[in-house]
Amino acid sequence: MGYSFDRASKDVVKKLQGRDLRPVECLSDATKFRLFHILQETPRSGWETEDIPVGFTLLDLLEPNFPVPEPEVSAPKPFIHVQSTDLEANLNVADIARGGVGYVGYGGYNIEVQSTSIPNPKLEILQNRKLLDNLPTFMKFCRMERKNLYVVTEAYEVSKDTMLTGLSSVNLSVKGFFKQLFKVRGKAGRSEKYSIPIPKGSVLAYKKQQLVIENNTCVILPSATKKKMTFPGTPKYASASEPTEIYRTELQGLWINDIVPIGRIQEPAHLDFMCLQNEVYKQTEQLAELSKGVQEVVLSSILSMLYEGDRKVLYDLMNMLELNQLGHMDGPGGKILDELRKDSSNPCVDLKDLILYLLQALMVLSDSQLNLLAQSVEMGILPHQVELVKSILQPNFKYPWNIPFTLQPQLLAPLQGEGLAITYELLEECGLKMELNNPRSTWDLEAKMPLSALYGSLSFLQQLRKANSSSKPSLRPGYI
Protein backbone atom coordinates (compact mmCIF):
# COMPACT_ATOMS: atom_id res chain seq x y z
CA MET A 1 0.00 0.00 0.00
CA GLY A 2 2.18 2.82 -1.23
CA TYR A 3 1.29 6.13 0.39
CA SER A 4 1.20 8.36 -2.68
CA PHE A 5 1.54 12.14 -2.73
CA ASP A 6 -2.10 12.74 -3.65
CA ARG A 7 -3.28 10.44 -0.88
CA ALA A 8 -1.10 12.22 1.68
CA SER A 9 -2.42 15.60 0.46
CA LYS A 10 -6.04 14.50 0.87
CA ASP A 11 -5.21 13.14 4.32
CA VAL A 12 -3.65 16.43 5.43
CA VAL A 13 -6.65 18.39 4.11
CA LYS A 14 -8.96 16.18 6.16
CA LYS A 15 -6.88 16.76 9.30
CA LEU A 16 -6.64 20.53 8.78
CA GLN A 17 -10.44 20.73 8.45
CA GLY A 18 -10.17 24.05 6.65
CA ARG A 19 -13.15 25.38 4.76
CA ASP A 20 -12.68 25.43 0.95
CA LEU A 21 -9.25 23.78 1.33
CA ARG A 22 -8.29 21.65 -1.67
CA PRO A 23 -5.53 19.03 -2.00
CA VAL A 24 -2.78 19.14 -4.63
CA GLU A 25 -2.90 15.86 -6.53
CA CYS A 26 0.32 15.82 -8.54
CA LEU A 27 3.79 16.12 -7.03
CA SER A 28 5.23 17.55 -10.24
CA ASP A 29 2.85 20.51 -9.92
CA ALA A 30 3.32 20.98 -6.17
CA THR A 31 5.24 24.24 -6.68
CA LYS A 32 2.60 25.66 -9.06
CA PHE A 33 0.01 26.18 -6.31
CA ARG A 34 1.93 28.77 -4.32
CA LEU A 35 0.61 32.22 -3.46
CA PHE A 36 -0.68 34.32 -6.38
CA HIS A 37 -0.50 31.44 -8.89
CA ILE A 38 -3.41 31.47 -11.34
CA LEU A 39 -5.57 28.37 -11.81
CA GLN A 40 -8.04 27.52 -14.56
CA GLU A 41 -11.07 25.58 -13.38
CA THR A 42 -12.16 22.74 -15.65
CA PRO A 43 -15.03 20.28 -15.05
CA ARG A 44 -14.19 16.63 -14.44
CA SER A 45 -17.45 15.30 -15.81
CA GLY A 46 -19.51 13.56 -13.18
CA TRP A 47 -16.99 13.55 -10.38
CA GLU A 48 -15.57 17.01 -9.70
CA THR A 49 -13.68 19.97 -11.12
CA GLU A 50 -9.96 20.23 -11.77
CA ASP A 51 -7.76 23.27 -11.08
CA ILE A 52 -5.08 23.52 -13.74
CA PRO A 53 -2.07 25.82 -13.14
CA VAL A 54 -1.62 28.04 -16.18
CA GLY A 55 2.04 28.80 -15.45
CA PHE A 56 1.54 32.47 -14.55
CA THR A 57 0.98 34.36 -11.32
CA LEU A 58 -1.32 37.31 -10.82
CA LEU A 59 1.76 39.48 -10.37
CA ASP A 60 2.84 38.57 -13.92
CA LEU A 61 -0.37 40.09 -15.31
CA LEU A 62 -0.42 43.38 -13.43
CA GLU A 63 1.33 46.55 -14.50
CA PRO A 64 4.79 46.88 -12.91
CA ASN A 65 5.80 49.11 -10.00
CA PHE A 66 2.94 48.30 -7.67
CA PRO A 67 3.06 47.29 -3.98
CA VAL A 68 2.82 43.58 -3.16
CA PRO A 69 1.18 42.49 0.11
CA GLU A 70 3.41 40.65 2.58
CA PRO A 71 2.22 37.07 3.22
CA GLU A 72 1.48 35.77 6.69
CA VAL A 73 3.41 32.61 7.60
CA SER A 74 2.28 30.20 10.32
CA ALA A 75 4.43 27.98 12.53
CA PRO A 76 5.05 24.47 11.14
CA LYS A 77 2.50 21.80 12.09
CA PRO A 78 3.53 18.13 12.27
CA PHE A 79 1.36 15.46 10.62
CA ILE A 80 2.15 11.79 11.18
CA HIS A 81 0.22 8.90 9.69
CA VAL A 82 0.96 5.17 9.58
CA GLN A 83 -1.39 2.68 7.96
CA SER A 84 -0.97 -1.07 7.66
CA THR A 85 -3.15 -3.88 6.31
CA ASP A 86 -2.70 -7.62 6.78
CA LEU A 87 -5.34 -9.76 5.07
CA GLU A 88 -5.71 -13.48 4.55
CA ALA A 89 -8.50 -15.54 3.02
CA ASN A 90 -9.26 -19.08 1.89
CA LEU A 91 -11.31 -19.06 -1.28
CA ASN A 92 -13.40 -21.66 -3.07
CA VAL A 93 -13.91 -21.60 -6.81
CA ALA A 94 -16.93 -23.72 -7.78
CA ASP A 95 -15.47 -26.60 -5.75
CA ILE A 96 -12.74 -27.00 -8.39
CA ALA A 97 -9.83 -25.78 -6.41
CA ARG A 98 -8.97 -24.47 -3.00
CA GLY A 99 -6.35 -21.84 -2.51
CA GLY A 100 -5.36 -18.94 -0.34
CA VAL A 101 -4.49 -15.34 -0.88
CA GLY A 102 -2.78 -12.89 1.43
CA TYR A 103 -2.18 -9.16 1.19
CA VAL A 104 0.16 -7.08 3.32
CA GLY A 105 0.30 -3.32 2.96
CA TYR A 106 2.13 -0.57 4.82
CA GLY A 107 2.42 3.13 4.16
CA GLY A 108 2.70 6.45 5.89
CA TYR A 109 4.32 9.84 6.27
CA ASN A 110 5.83 12.26 8.77
CA ILE A 111 5.36 15.76 7.38
CA GLU A 112 5.72 19.29 8.72
CA VAL A 113 3.43 21.81 7.02
CA GLN A 114 3.16 25.59 7.35
CA SER A 115 0.67 27.94 5.75
CA THR A 116 1.43 31.11 3.82
CA SER A 117 -1.59 33.31 3.21
CA ILE A 118 -2.81 36.72 2.12
CA PRO A 119 -5.91 37.64 4.15
CA ASN A 120 -8.65 39.66 2.46
CA PRO A 121 -7.66 42.99 4.10
CA LYS A 122 -4.17 42.71 2.60
CA LEU A 123 -5.64 41.80 -0.81
CA GLU A 124 -7.11 45.30 -0.99
CA ILE A 125 -3.73 46.49 -2.28
CA LEU A 126 -4.29 44.44 -5.44
CA GLN A 127 -7.96 45.23 -6.03
CA ASN A 128 -8.83 47.11 -9.24
CA ARG A 129 -5.24 47.06 -10.43
CA LYS A 130 -4.70 47.62 -14.12
CA LEU A 131 -3.55 44.69 -16.24
CA LEU A 132 -0.81 44.68 -18.84
CA ASP A 133 -1.84 45.79 -22.31
CA ASN A 134 -0.35 42.64 -23.88
CA LEU A 135 -1.70 39.71 -21.90
CA PRO A 136 -0.51 36.10 -22.38
CA THR A 137 -2.23 33.97 -25.02
CA PHE A 138 -3.95 31.77 -22.46
CA MET A 139 -5.96 34.80 -21.27
CA LYS A 140 -7.41 35.29 -24.74
CA PHE A 141 -8.34 31.61 -24.88
CA CYS A 142 -10.01 31.76 -21.46
CA ARG A 143 -11.96 34.88 -22.43
CA MET A 144 -13.16 33.28 -25.66
CA GLU A 145 -14.11 29.99 -23.98
CA ARG A 146 -15.54 31.67 -20.87
CA LYS A 147 -13.16 29.82 -18.58
CA ASN A 148 -13.02 30.85 -14.96
CA LEU A 149 -9.71 31.80 -13.38
CA TYR A 150 -8.73 31.75 -9.71
CA VAL A 151 -5.77 32.97 -7.69
CA VAL A 152 -4.16 31.05 -4.81
CA THR A 153 -4.47 33.08 -1.60
CA GLU A 154 -3.44 30.43 0.92
CA ALA A 155 -0.99 27.54 0.52
CA TYR A 156 0.14 24.82 2.90
CA GLU A 157 3.77 24.03 2.09
CA VAL A 158 6.11 21.30 3.34
CA SER A 159 8.56 23.09 5.66
CA LYS A 160 11.40 20.57 5.24
CA ASP A 161 12.37 17.71 2.95
CA THR A 162 10.49 14.51 3.75
CA MET A 163 9.83 11.03 2.36
CA LEU A 164 6.72 8.97 1.73
CA THR A 165 7.37 5.25 2.14
CA GLY A 166 5.32 2.13 1.68
CA LEU A 167 5.20 -1.58 0.91
CA SER A 168 2.58 -3.79 -0.73
CA SER A 169 2.81 -7.55 -1.08
CA VAL A 170 0.39 -10.14 -2.47
CA ASN A 171 1.02 -13.86 -1.88
CA LEU A 172 -1.11 -16.43 -3.68
CA SER A 173 -1.08 -20.15 -2.92
CA VAL A 174 -2.67 -22.28 -5.63
CA LYS A 175 -3.68 -25.91 -5.89
CA GLY A 176 -5.23 -28.32 -8.36
CA PHE A 177 -6.65 -26.62 -11.43
CA PHE A 178 -5.05 -23.27 -10.60
CA LYS A 179 -1.60 -24.81 -10.36
CA GLN A 180 -1.82 -25.50 -14.10
CA LEU A 181 -3.44 -22.17 -14.80
CA PHE A 182 -0.71 -20.14 -13.10
CA LYS A 183 2.05 -22.65 -13.97
CA VAL A 184 3.56 -22.40 -10.51
CA ARG A 185 3.99 -24.59 -7.49
CA GLY A 186 3.34 -23.64 -3.93
CA LYS A 187 3.14 -19.87 -3.71
CA ALA A 188 3.19 -17.02 -6.18
CA GLY A 189 3.50 -13.42 -5.13
CA ARG A 190 4.21 -9.82 -5.93
CA SER A 191 5.96 -7.32 -3.71
CA GLU A 192 6.63 -3.63 -4.27
CA LYS A 193 8.38 -1.01 -2.16
CA TYR A 194 7.65 2.69 -2.44
CA SER A 195 9.81 5.69 -1.64
CA ILE A 196 8.73 9.17 -2.76
CA PRO A 197 10.79 12.25 -1.81
CA ILE A 198 8.77 15.41 -1.09
CA PRO A 199 11.05 18.48 -1.33
CA LYS A 200 10.75 21.50 0.91
CA GLY A 201 8.32 24.07 -0.46
CA SER A 202 5.97 21.54 -2.08
CA VAL A 203 2.35 22.59 -1.67
CA LEU A 204 0.01 19.95 -0.25
CA ALA A 205 -3.16 22.04 -0.02
CA TYR A 206 -4.41 25.47 -1.04
CA LYS A 207 -7.32 27.89 -1.04
CA LYS A 208 -8.33 29.91 -4.06
CA GLN A 209 -10.38 33.02 -4.74
CA GLN A 210 -12.00 33.94 -8.01
CA LEU A 211 -10.69 36.58 -10.37
CA VAL A 212 -13.05 38.92 -12.19
CA ILE A 213 -11.51 40.82 -15.10
CA GLU A 214 -13.37 43.75 -16.62
CA ASN A 215 -12.29 46.99 -18.26
CA ASN A 216 -8.68 45.78 -18.14
CA THR A 217 -8.66 45.67 -14.34
CA CYS A 218 -8.87 42.75 -11.95
CA VAL A 219 -10.93 42.14 -8.83
CA ILE A 220 -10.37 39.28 -6.38
CA LEU A 221 -13.66 38.05 -4.95
CA PRO A 222 -13.79 37.20 -1.22
CA SER A 223 -14.23 33.49 -1.98
CA ALA A 224 -14.26 30.94 -4.80
CA THR A 225 -18.05 30.86 -5.12
CA LYS A 226 -19.45 30.74 -8.64
CA LYS A 227 -21.60 33.85 -8.56
CA LYS A 228 -19.73 35.68 -11.29
CA MET A 229 -17.60 34.84 -14.26
CA THR A 230 -13.98 35.84 -14.71
CA PHE A 231 -14.95 37.55 -17.98
CA PRO A 232 -18.54 38.68 -17.27
CA GLY A 233 -18.96 40.75 -20.42
CA THR A 234 -18.10 37.96 -22.86
CA PRO A 235 -21.16 36.00 -24.04
CA LYS A 236 -20.55 32.57 -25.50
CA TYR A 237 -22.67 32.52 -28.63
CA ALA A 238 -24.21 29.23 -29.61
CA SER A 239 -23.03 27.69 -32.86
CA ALA A 240 -25.23 25.97 -35.42
CA SER A 241 -23.88 22.57 -34.48
CA GLU A 242 -24.29 23.21 -30.75
CA PRO A 243 -27.19 25.67 -30.31
CA THR A 244 -27.96 24.97 -26.68
CA GLU A 245 -26.74 23.11 -23.68
CA ILE A 246 -28.92 20.00 -23.55
CA TYR A 247 -29.27 18.01 -20.43
CA ARG A 248 -31.45 15.17 -19.28
CA THR A 249 -33.88 15.64 -16.40
CA GLU A 250 -34.18 12.11 -15.09
CA LEU A 251 -36.97 12.78 -12.62
CA GLN A 252 -39.32 14.08 -15.33
CA GLY A 253 -38.01 11.92 -18.15
CA LEU A 254 -37.94 14.92 -20.47
CA TRP A 255 -35.35 16.49 -22.73
CA ILE A 256 -34.87 20.17 -21.90
CA ASN A 257 -33.01 22.81 -23.90
CA ASP A 258 -31.41 25.34 -21.63
CA ILE A 259 -29.47 28.44 -22.63
CA VAL A 260 -27.13 29.56 -19.87
CA PRO A 261 -27.75 33.24 -18.98
CA ILE A 262 -24.98 35.63 -19.95
CA GLY A 263 -22.71 36.59 -17.08
CA ARG A 264 -23.64 33.66 -14.87
CA ILE A 265 -22.51 30.11 -14.46
CA GLN A 266 -25.14 27.42 -14.36
CA GLU A 267 -24.99 25.34 -11.19
CA PRO A 268 -24.62 21.64 -12.01
CA ALA A 269 -27.82 19.62 -11.98
CA HIS A 270 -28.24 17.02 -9.25
CA LEU A 271 -26.51 13.81 -10.28
CA ASP A 272 -27.85 10.44 -9.21
CA PHE A 273 -26.26 7.18 -10.24
CA MET A 274 -28.49 6.89 -13.31
CA CYS A 275 -27.06 10.18 -14.59
CA LEU A 276 -23.51 8.93 -14.05
CA GLN A 277 -24.33 5.59 -15.66
CA ASN A 278 -25.91 7.26 -18.70
CA GLU A 279 -22.95 9.62 -19.03
CA VAL A 280 -20.41 6.79 -18.94
CA TYR A 281 -22.53 4.71 -21.33
CA LYS A 282 -22.73 7.59 -23.81
CA GLN A 283 -18.96 8.11 -23.69
CA THR A 284 -18.14 4.42 -24.16
CA GLU A 285 -20.63 4.21 -27.03
CA GLN A 286 -18.75 7.00 -28.80
CA LEU A 287 -15.47 5.28 -28.00
CA ALA A 288 -16.74 2.11 -29.70
CA GLU A 289 -17.35 4.08 -32.91
CA LEU A 290 -13.63 4.81 -33.29
CA SER A 291 -11.60 2.61 -35.57
CA LYS A 292 -9.92 -0.44 -34.09
CA GLY A 293 -6.50 1.03 -34.89
CA VAL A 294 -7.20 4.24 -32.96
CA GLN A 295 -8.49 2.27 -29.97
CA GLU A 296 -5.35 0.10 -30.02
CA VAL A 297 -3.10 3.17 -29.91
CA VAL A 298 -5.11 4.71 -27.06
CA LEU A 299 -5.15 1.49 -25.02
CA SER A 300 -1.46 0.66 -25.41
CA SER A 301 -0.45 4.28 -24.70
CA ILE A 302 -2.63 4.58 -21.60
CA LEU A 303 -1.44 1.21 -20.29
CA SER A 304 2.19 2.21 -20.75
CA MET A 305 1.59 5.30 -18.63
CA LEU A 306 -0.31 3.28 -16.00
CA TYR A 307 2.41 0.63 -15.77
CA GLU A 308 5.10 3.29 -15.40
CA GLY A 309 3.10 4.75 -12.52
CA ASP A 310 4.13 8.24 -13.64
CA ARG A 311 1.20 10.49 -12.79
CA LYS A 312 3.12 13.46 -14.20
CA VAL A 313 2.89 12.08 -17.76
CA LEU A 314 -0.87 11.60 -17.47
CA TYR A 315 -1.22 15.03 -15.89
CA ASP A 316 0.89 16.77 -18.52
CA LEU A 317 -1.11 15.14 -21.32
CA MET A 318 -4.38 16.17 -19.69
CA ASN A 319 -3.17 19.75 -19.29
CA MET A 320 -2.13 19.94 -22.94
CA LEU A 321 -5.55 18.75 -24.06
CA GLU A 322 -7.36 21.05 -21.61
CA LEU A 323 -5.46 24.03 -23.02
CA ASN A 324 -6.01 22.75 -26.58
CA GLN A 325 -2.27 22.36 -27.17
CA LEU A 326 -1.28 19.48 -29.46
CA GLY A 327 2.47 20.13 -29.43
CA HIS A 328 5.34 17.69 -29.04
CA MET A 329 5.40 15.10 -26.27
CA ASP A 330 7.70 12.12 -25.88
CA GLY A 331 6.62 8.59 -25.04
CA PRO A 332 3.11 7.11 -25.10
CA GLY A 333 1.46 10.50 -24.62
CA GLY A 334 3.06 11.59 -27.89
CA LYS A 335 1.40 8.68 -29.72
CA ILE A 336 -2.01 9.89 -28.56
CA LEU A 337 -1.21 13.43 -29.71
CA ASP A 338 -0.16 12.01 -33.09
CA GLU A 339 -3.61 10.42 -33.45
CA LEU A 340 -5.28 13.69 -32.54
CA ARG A 341 -3.25 15.59 -35.13
CA LYS A 342 -4.23 13.06 -37.81
CA ASP A 343 -7.90 13.88 -37.16
CA SER A 344 -8.84 10.81 -39.21
CA SER A 345 -11.31 9.34 -36.74
CA ASN A 346 -15.09 9.35 -37.01
CA PRO A 347 -16.09 13.01 -37.65
CA CYS A 348 -19.07 12.56 -35.30
CA VAL A 349 -16.79 11.56 -32.42
CA ASP A 350 -14.47 13.98 -30.62
CA LEU A 351 -11.41 11.87 -29.78
CA LYS A 352 -9.86 14.64 -27.70
CA ASP A 353 -12.90 14.90 -25.44
CA LEU A 354 -13.03 11.13 -24.99
CA ILE A 355 -9.37 10.94 -23.98
CA LEU A 356 -9.85 13.91 -21.65
CA TYR A 357 -12.80 12.16 -20.03
CA LEU A 358 -10.66 9.11 -19.28
CA LEU A 359 -7.66 11.16 -18.09
CA GLN A 360 -9.83 13.24 -15.77
CA ALA A 361 -11.25 10.07 -14.22
CA LEU A 362 -7.78 8.53 -13.83
CA MET A 363 -6.43 11.65 -12.12
CA VAL A 364 -9.00 11.22 -9.33
CA LEU A 365 -7.47 7.84 -8.49
CA SER A 366 -4.32 7.17 -6.47
CA ASP A 367 -0.96 6.09 -7.92
CA SER A 368 -1.51 2.57 -6.58
CA GLN A 369 -4.87 2.35 -8.32
CA LEU A 370 -3.36 3.36 -11.66
CA ASN A 371 -0.97 0.40 -11.55
CA LEU A 372 -3.73 -1.92 -10.34
CA LEU A 373 -5.90 -0.87 -13.29
CA ALA A 374 -3.15 -1.90 -15.72
CA GLN A 375 -2.91 -5.29 -14.03
CA SER A 376 -6.70 -5.65 -14.18
CA VAL A 377 -6.67 -5.05 -17.94
CA GLU A 378 -4.03 -7.71 -18.48
CA MET A 379 -5.85 -10.23 -16.27
CA GLY A 380 -9.10 -9.67 -18.20
CA ILE A 381 -11.20 -9.01 -15.09
CA LEU A 382 -12.56 -5.57 -16.04
CA PRO A 383 -16.17 -6.68 -16.79
CA HIS A 384 -16.45 -8.29 -13.35
CA GLN A 385 -14.95 -5.24 -11.66
CA VAL A 386 -17.35 -2.88 -13.46
CA GLU A 387 -20.36 -4.86 -12.22
CA LEU A 388 -18.98 -5.03 -8.69
CA VAL A 389 -18.36 -1.27 -8.47
CA LYS A 390 -21.78 -0.63 -10.01
CA SER A 391 -23.40 -2.84 -7.34
CA ILE A 392 -21.85 -0.61 -4.65
CA LEU A 393 -22.67 2.75 -6.25
CA GLN A 394 -26.20 2.09 -7.47
CA PRO A 395 -27.99 1.58 -4.12
CA ASN A 396 -25.81 3.96 -2.07
CA PHE A 397 -25.06 6.87 -4.43
CA LYS A 398 -27.66 9.28 -3.03
CA TYR A 399 -26.97 8.68 0.67
CA PRO A 400 -24.69 11.08 2.63
CA TRP A 401 -24.39 8.84 5.68
CA ASN A 402 -22.61 5.57 6.46
CA ILE A 403 -24.62 2.50 5.41
CA PRO A 404 -23.49 -1.14 5.82
CA PHE A 405 -23.63 -3.22 2.64
CA THR A 406 -22.68 -6.72 1.52
CA LEU A 407 -21.01 -7.54 -1.78
CA GLN A 408 -23.01 -10.03 -3.84
CA PRO A 409 -21.43 -13.54 -3.92
CA GLN A 410 -22.21 -14.02 -7.63
CA LEU A 411 -20.19 -10.89 -8.42
CA LEU A 412 -17.25 -11.99 -6.27
CA ALA A 413 -17.15 -15.54 -7.67
CA PRO A 414 -15.29 -14.65 -10.93
CA LEU A 415 -12.76 -12.57 -8.97
CA GLN A 416 -10.59 -15.17 -7.28
CA GLY A 417 -7.01 -15.26 -6.11
CA GLU A 418 -4.92 -12.30 -7.17
CA GLY A 419 -7.85 -10.82 -9.11
CA LEU A 420 -9.85 -10.52 -5.90
CA ALA A 421 -6.88 -9.05 -4.02
CA ILE A 422 -6.37 -6.44 -6.76
CA THR A 423 -10.08 -5.56 -6.81
CA TYR A 424 -10.29 -5.23 -3.03
CA GLU A 425 -7.22 -3.00 -3.03
CA LEU A 426 -8.85 -0.80 -5.69
CA LEU A 427 -11.92 -0.45 -3.46
CA GLU A 428 -9.86 0.12 -0.33
CA GLU A 429 -7.93 2.93 -2.03
CA CYS A 430 -11.31 4.60 -2.70
CA GLY A 431 -11.88 4.79 1.05
CA LEU A 432 -13.89 1.61 1.73
CA LYS A 433 -12.78 -0.75 4.48
CA MET A 434 -12.38 -4.15 2.84
CA GLU A 435 -11.42 -7.59 4.14
CA LEU A 436 -10.70 -10.45 1.76
CA ASN A 437 -12.55 -13.02 3.87
CA ASN A 438 -15.51 -10.73 4.59
CA PRO A 439 -17.90 -9.43 1.88
CA ARG A 440 -19.31 -6.77 4.23
CA SER A 441 -18.28 -3.13 4.23
CA THR A 442 -19.74 0.31 4.94
CA TRP A 443 -20.66 3.05 2.47
CA ASP A 444 -18.69 6.24 3.05
CA LEU A 445 -19.67 9.49 1.35
CA GLU A 446 -16.00 10.36 0.81
CA ALA A 447 -15.67 7.19 -1.29
CA LYS A 448 -18.38 8.35 -3.71
CA MET A 449 -16.17 10.49 -5.94
CA PRO A 450 -13.22 8.07 -6.31
CA LEU A 451 -15.64 5.13 -6.78
CA SER A 452 -17.42 7.07 -9.54
CA ALA A 453 -14.08 7.79 -11.21
CA LEU A 454 -13.11 4.12 -10.83
CA TYR A 455 -16.40 3.09 -12.45
CA GLY A 456 -15.78 5.42 -15.39
CA SER A 457 -12.14 4.32 -15.78
CA LEU A 458 -13.00 0.61 -15.68
CA SER A 459 -15.81 1.09 -18.22
CA PHE A 460 -13.52 2.97 -20.63
CA LEU A 461 -10.69 0.47 -20.34
CA GLN A 462 -13.16 -2.39 -20.76
CA GLN A 463 -14.33 -0.97 -24.09
CA LEU A 464 -10.75 -0.45 -25.28
CA ARG A 465 -9.81 -3.98 -24.18
CA LYS A 466 -12.87 -5.37 -25.95
CA ALA A 467 -11.84 -3.70 -29.22
CA ASN A 468 -8.37 -5.22 -28.90
CA SER A 469 -9.39 -8.70 -27.72
CA SER A 470 -9.71 -10.28 -31.17
CA SER A 471 -6.09 -9.57 -32.15
CA LYS A 472 -4.87 -10.31 -28.59
CA PRO A 473 -2.06 -7.75 -28.53
CA SER A 474 0.56 -7.61 -25.85
CA LEU A 475 -0.65 -5.14 -23.25
CA ARG A 476 2.75 -4.55 -21.70
CA PRO A 477 4.49 -1.18 -22.20
CA GLY A 478 6.10 -0.71 -25.58
CA TYR A 479 3.44 -2.54 -27.57
CA ILE A 480 3.11 0.29 -30.06
From Swiss-Prot:
The keyword Transmembrane helix does not apply. GO terms for biological process: intestinal epithelial cell development; programmed cell death. Cleavage by CASP8 relieves autoinhibition by releasing the N-terminal moiety (Gasdermin-C2, N-terminal) that initiates pyroptosis. Pfam families: Gasdermin, Gasdermin_C. InterPro entries: Gasdermin, Gasdermin_pore, Gasdermin_PUB. The keyword Iron-sulfur does not apply. Residues 1-226 are annotated as: Triggers pyroptosis. Induction: By type 2 cytokines in response to type-2 immunity following worm infection. Keywords: Cell membrane, Cytoplasm, Lipoprotein, Membrane, Necrosis, Palmitate, Transmembrane, Transmembrane beta strand. One of its GO terms (cellular component) is cytosol. Belongs to the gasdermin family. PANTHER family: GASDERMIN (PTHR16399), GASDERMIN-C (PTHR16399:SF21). Intramolecular interactions between N- and C-terminal domains are important for autoinhibition in the absence of activation signal. The intrinsic pyroptosis-inducing activity is carried by the N-terminal domain. This is Gasdermin-C2. It comes from Mus musculus. The gene is Gsdmc2.
